[in-house]
């Protein structure tokens, strides 16, 4: 997404020529004719006639420089961006109490990161608009400050974009402050070089070359090529992310289950395509591209913070504090007595949980079933009926095994049950009811009083 500011309404668009600085400026000046292939592209008179087309193109250029009446030097462009952002900031202030309460009761670093991005982006945008309105735009230093503010706000927005993608695609692996910091550093490695190139392209002294006596001085074609390529690349990235559920990549990353994330990606694809088309039209010396640039840039700097809020934060902030089923929440399951997290190799195969393989559930030492613990020697001893002992894992057809995973560490009942079960010889196949898993992936069977020796 490009940057539009007073001295540069769109990436690589040069300084604005106004009636205050150009005596030859005339409000009734006719609009320069576009190339023939551009005129052919917009020549469908069933939708828009040539006169209306010229008016629209003129409006797309005027909106960046015209100021409010009454002696104020406030541009319509700044006011149009400021008012929606002020309304959204008021909305955020009204939600501030509930947001703080949610952040204090919850333990989600991703939620805090998204909240910070929304508030900071909105505040920086408002500060830029207010400061731009106070500038006379006649001093070169003030113009440079205004350009710098636009670069800063673009940097914040671009970083927020990459953070949203990172949190959305890797939310199952980002559940602590350190992982959030690593993800943020990764996004900075992309946004900082992009912003540096943008500064080099935009902060240049340019001349009035091919569009005389009109609003804009256009820089060299290299800036537009960078603009087209950067916008097209971002559009391809978002489009590829939208296609991830259709390819095998979903085996390696946990994608958001709801559709709001993909709607967000679709909107960003549309905005970046409009930016790329607008830059391409301006590259071919057509002022029609200013309409594409103006619309996409306005939507971006006005609606992006609300899009982030309603896509990633609204549902999570409305959930009760004890609900851990947020969009970007992932936690290990705790055992019943709170003795710690379950092992990383724990893949239960019950409804609502994911298991890569049913065999992984029973991935443990086979010989452990045929040993018992000798208290006198403090070690496990192989059962004498090693070759004849058989305990197949067959569920009874009469009763259904209880879907309960027992994770009590150091349970005396389990040790007593295991020793009693292994101490009695088995001459044939017996059916036992599997209750669940014990410590270290061991099996826990239903109590069978007939097999226990007191």
Swiss-Prot record:
Transmembrane segments: 80-100, 113-133, 151-171, 180-200, 224-244, 262-282, 290-310
Membrane topology: Multi-pass membrane protein
Keyword Transmembrane: yes
Annotated localization: Membrane
Pfam families listed in its UniProt record: Tmemb_40 (PF10160)
Family classification: Belongs to the UPF0359 family.
Protein name per the record: Transmembrane protein adipocyte-associated 1 homolog
Organism encoding this protein: Caenorhabditis briggsae
Lineage, broadest ranks: Eukaryota, Metazoa, Ecdysozoa, Nematoda, Chromadorea
């Amino acid at each position: 997404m490009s940057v539009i500011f007073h001295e540069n309404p769109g990436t690589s668009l040069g300084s604005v020529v106004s009636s205050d600085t150009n005596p030859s400026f005339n409000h009734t000046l006719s609009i320069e004719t576009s190339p023939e292939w551009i005129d052919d592209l917009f020549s469908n008179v069933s939708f828009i006639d040539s006169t209306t087309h010229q008016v629209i193109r003129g409006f797309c250029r005027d909106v960046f420089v015209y100021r409010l009446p009454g002696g104020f030097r406030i541009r319509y462009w700044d006011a149009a961006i400021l008012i929606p952002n002020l309304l959204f900031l008021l909305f955020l202030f009204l939600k501030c109490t509930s947001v703080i309460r949610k952040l204090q009761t919850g333990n989600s670093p991703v939620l805090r990161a998204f909240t910070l991005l929304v508030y900071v982006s909105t505040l920086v945008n408002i500060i830029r608009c207010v400061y731009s309105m106070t500038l006379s735009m006649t001093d070169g230093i003030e113009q440079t400050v205004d350009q710098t503010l636009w670069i800063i706000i673009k940097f914040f927005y671009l970083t927020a974009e990459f953070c949203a993608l990172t949190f959305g695609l890797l939310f199952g692996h980002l559940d602590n402050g350190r992982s959030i910091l690593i993800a943020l550093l990764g996004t900075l490695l992309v946004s900082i070089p992009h912003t540096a190139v943008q500064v080099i392209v935009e902060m240049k002294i340019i001349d009035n070359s091919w569009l005389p006596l009109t609003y804009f001085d256009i820089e060299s074609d290299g800036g537009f090529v960078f603009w087209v390529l950067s916008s097209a690349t971002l559009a391809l990235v978002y489009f590829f992310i939208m296609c991830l559920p259709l390819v095998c990549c979903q085996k390696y990353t946990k994608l958001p289950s709801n559709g709001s994330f993909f709607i967000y990606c679709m909107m960003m694809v549309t905005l970046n395509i409009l930016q790329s088309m607008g830059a391409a039209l301006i590259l071919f010396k057509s002022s029609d591209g200013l309409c594409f640039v103006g619309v996409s840039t306005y939507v971006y700097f006005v609606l992006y913070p609300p899009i982030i809020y309603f896509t990633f934060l609204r549902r999570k902030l409305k959930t009760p504090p004890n609900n851990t089923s947020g969009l970007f929440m992932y936690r290990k399951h705790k055992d019943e007595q709170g003795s710690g997290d379950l092992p990383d190799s724990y893949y239960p195969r019950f409804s609502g949980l994911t298991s890569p393989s049913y065999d992984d559930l029973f991935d443990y030492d086979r010989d452990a079933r045929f040993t018992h613990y000798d208290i006198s020697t403090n070690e496990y001893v192989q059962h004498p009926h090693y070759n004849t002992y058989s305990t197949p894992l067959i569920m009874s057809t009469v009763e259904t095994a209880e879907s309960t995973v027992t994770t009590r560490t150091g349970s005396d009942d389990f040790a007593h049950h295991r020793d009693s079960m292994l101490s009695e010889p088995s001459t044939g196949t017996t059916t036992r009811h599997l209750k669940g898993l014990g410590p270290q992936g061991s099996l826990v069977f239903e109590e069978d009083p007939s097999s226990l020796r007191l």
